[in-house]
């Protein structure tokens, strides 16, 4: 995909995945990579920002002698996801109108 993906779309994708199950960072990056070209060095700042905004929380769980940090969506995160979905629908509708030549004023 050659289109630049906005931070809001990446945040929404992360939050949407976390509505299904909790993920640790690497697994979450792997899931997002299935759709968007993203590196761990891009993902972790997004996760920190989402946590700072209280849109997700974290907990540690032992795995093979090490701790994995898992991310979990919060109620505020669900609200933010709904806002992102609404913004996306508005953008999609406007973009579709332009691309299909239906942008009447």
Please report, for each region that a protein language model flagged, where it lies by residue.
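Short, hydrophobic-biased segments on the C-terminal half of alpha helices
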Residues: 47-49
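N-terminal helix-turn-helix DNA-binding core of bacterial DNA-binding proteins
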Residues: 2-44
